Regions:
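N-terminal glycine-rich phosphate-binding loop for ADP-containing cofactors
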Residues: 1-258
Length: 258
């Protein structure tokens, strides 16, 4: 099967951006991993050698990832077939990043966001109609090498051809199971996950349970990952969990669980 996504730019060398670049490397796909400074970009690449569970299938795969920064290396974006944004869950920051890269996109380049739940309609407000045709949500879950789920969300302007291409690429080259979501608050996975997690915290407080007790009750004993509610939240990051929770709260005023 042919693959015409030969090189990727990952914008944001934090927890998810670096690991997504690592998973691309596992599939033999080179990437440029960007951050606001060269030091942060190199730190993102370097951390892939020490994270547990290991993000890289083979240690040498790290050679496929090039650390880059926005001040010196934006020209490299002209070389890539897919630009994946994985910066902080802050709409203003995401808009700034999109604006900075627009002049460097080649006409066929696909652009996507790894947002945990910010509406696609909000993300694309700073994009031209032409770029909107090539934009979609590609939401990986942490850790991306091991979590099979990949959520895809398209907007009203997204090309069906590009959307289907990314679904095929995710399944056949990255080994993902594709969930096709709609542009609703937090899409599918986090809409369910943040509701269940926050409800478990509420019940724990009411019942006087410890974090350890909750994780035992919400882990393998009920057929879920051993991390349970609190450890999963810790892995995801409290800042990300708070952002995802706020997305649901702010955009679902009539939800019965509000």
């Amino acid at each position: 099967m042919s693959n015409n996504i030969e090189k990727v730019a990952v914008l944001g060398a934090g927890t998810m951006g670096a690991q997504i670049a690592g998973h691309l490397a596992n599939a033999g796909i080179p990437s440029c991993l960007f951050d606001i400074s060269q030091e942060l970009a190199e730190k993102g690449v370097g951390i892939l050698t020490s994270l547990k569970p290991a993000p890289l299938y083979k240690p040498k795969n790290i050679e496929l990832i090039e650390a880059c920064n926005y001040d010196q290396h934006l020209e490299k974006i002209k070389e890539v077939d897919w630009i994946l944004e994985a910066v902080a869950e802050n709409l203003e920051i995401k808009h700034k990043v999109y604006t900075n890269i627009m002049d460097y996109l080649k006409d066929t380049a696909i652009v996507s966001s790894n947002t945990s739940g910010i509406p696609l309609a909000d993300l694309t407000k700073v994009m031209s109609d032409e770029v909107k045709k090539r934009f979609l949500i590609t939401h990986f879950f942490n850790p991306p090498r091991y979590m099979r789920l990949l959520e895809l969300v398209k907007g009203p302007n997204t090309s069906d051809e590009i959307y289907n291409k990314m679904a095929s690429f995710g399944e056949n080259f990255l080994g993902k199971g594709i969930v096709h979501g709609k542009d609703t608050p937090n899409f599918v996975g986090n809409r369910i996950g943040v509701h269940g997690g926050n409800n478990a915290v509420r019940l724990a407080i009411e019942m006087g349970l410890t974090c350890e007790e909750v994780d035992k009750l919400t882990g393998t004993i009920v057929g879920r990952p051993k991390s349970g509610v609190f450890r999963t939240t810790d892995i995801v990051g409290l800042d990300v969990h708070a952002s995802v929770s706020a997305t649901s709260y702010n955009n679902l005023p009539d939800d019965e669980a509000r």
